[in-house]
Amino acid sequence: MCSYYHMKKRSVSGCNITIFAVMFSHLSAGKSPCGNQANVLCISRLEFVQYQS
């Protein structure tokens, strides 16, 4: 999972990784092996809306 954080620049394909990085840092703090960065994924915007609410 950690590799996704380093590959974020390559995964930019219609979604704003920067926003996900910020939001996930609050959502998944301490819940993943490598901390906040592990869950920084380019998920669909529909899923992102669900995470916001």
Swiss-Prot record:
Database matches in InterPro entries: IGIP
Entry keywords, A to Z: Secreted, Signal
Any one of the GO CC terms: extracellular region
Domain of life of the organism encoding this protein: Eukaryota
Signal peptide: 1-30
Record flagged with keyword Ligase: no
Subcellular location(s) per record: Secreted
Principal location class: secreted
Entry-linked PANTHER family: IGA-INDUCING PROTEIN HOMOLOG
Biological role: Enhances IgA secretion from B-cells stimulated via CD40.
Protein name (record): IgA-inducing protein homolog
Organism the protein comes from: Homo sapiens
Underlying gene: IGIP
